[in-house]
Amino acid sequence: MNNVILYCRPGFEKECSAEVTEKAAAREIFGFARVKDNSGYVVFVCYQHEEADRLVRVLPLRSLIFARQMILVGELLRDLPAEDRITQIAGMLTGAVAGAGEVRVEVPDTNESKELMKFCRKLTVPLRAALRAQRILKGEEHRSPQVIHVLFIAPGCCYAGYSYRDNHSPFYMGIPRLRFPPDAPSRSMLKLEEAFHVFIPADEWDERLGSGMYAVDLGACPGGWTYQLVKRSMMVHAVDNGTMDEALMATGQVIHHRADGFRFEPPRNNVYWLVCDMVEKPSRVAQLAADWLVKGWCREAIFNLKLPMKKRYEEVSQNLRLLIDHLQVNGVHGEVHAKQLYHDREEVTVHARRFWSAVPGRRDER
């Protein structure tokens, strides 16, 4: 197996390809990408067979902006007979996987592929039984290092391979399944909820997303992101010249500031979260978030960067470098991650966390 498949948002295959090629080369792993527009996935072919397995181990999925999932697969299985699709799939996995803990039969995130979802669900049960009989899969759901993936790209055509549990998305197809509450003022609240799932480990939610925290939402109206914070029992300063959702204001957890988000300064010293989903130039939003973190006005920030029509990977990379450089120059130790979420469109979501500052006299939590 020398192919690495990366799931991505349809229309962003070129960005995903450029990113994996660049970051693989930085680890001295070389190959080429096969890209089909609007397919929802990229195939990165490593020149050396053993390098593909190394790539899915050493390249953190978390470091990839445009990839939702990363799996190692063999060659495309074509024209699988309708009466027996399982034999060839099991044959591809034999010798490559032993004692995996889970099997996922998936499709790319396209309208055409979603027509195969019903078939994938039907195939999963007999495939699981066959793989268990051959000891490719353990006898019960198990947290084994490997997870088997079968990716159908068309009827009778699939890739079969695996991911490593410590470097993959835990979500089916790399997509968290979230419910839109009927009382939410905007579907944008799903972006922030997904960001929490992607960026914040579940065992740290009580500490970092806890009740009673203070947050600032810049560009808040009508209140989609504020809603998500309020549901987590936070106190929110919502900053926007527009009108906030009345039900949100009635909770007593929101203070509405009619102000420019780029000029607003927090009225408290204990704001933990900054969130921002303003339609602005990405460089301006990145600089704004960097300023908040450097000044110690917040401890963590989640914000969206709207993407241009062309050179989208270059634009994101440039703005992330701006943010990281600004923190480093000002002696702020932290971490920065970015991901194009399922609920994002022509944008990416960035998470930045401040640990401590080397400069005394700032609002700081050591």
UniProtKB/Swiss-Prot annotation:
GO MF annotation terms: S-adenosylmethionine-dependent methyltransferase activity
Compartments, record wording: Cytoplasm
Top-level enzyme category: transferase
Pfam families for this protein: FtsJ, RlmM_FDX, RLMM_N
EC number: 2.1.1.186
Keyword Lipid biosynthesis tagged: no
InterPro entries: RlmM_FDX, RlmM_THUMP-like, RNA_MeTrfase_FtsJ_dom, rRNA_MeTrfase_M, SAM-dependent_MTases_sf
Residues binding S-adenosyl-L-methionine: S188, C221, P222, G223, G224, D240, D260, D277
Alphabetical UniProt keywords: Cytoplasm, Methyltransferase, rRNA processing, S-adenosyl-L-methionine, Transferase
Keyword rRNA processing attached: yes
GO cellular component: cytoplasm
GO process terms (BP): methylation; rRNA processing
Catalytic activity, as annotated: cytidine(2498) in 23S rRNA + S-adenosyl-L-methionine = 2'-O-methylcytidine(2498) in 23S rRNA + S-adenosyl-L-homocysteine + H(+)
Active site: K306 (proton acceptor)
Family: Belongs to the class I-like SAM-binding methyltransferase superfamily. RNA methyltransferase RlmE family. RlmM subfamily.
Subunit structure: Monomer.
Function comment: Catalyzes the 2'-O-methylation at nucleotide C2498 in 23S rRNA.
Name of this chain's protein: Ribosomal RNA large subunit methyltransferase M
Source organism phylogeny: Bacteria, Pseudomonadati, Pseudomonadota, Gammaproteobacteria, Enterobacterales
Gene encoding the protein: rlmM
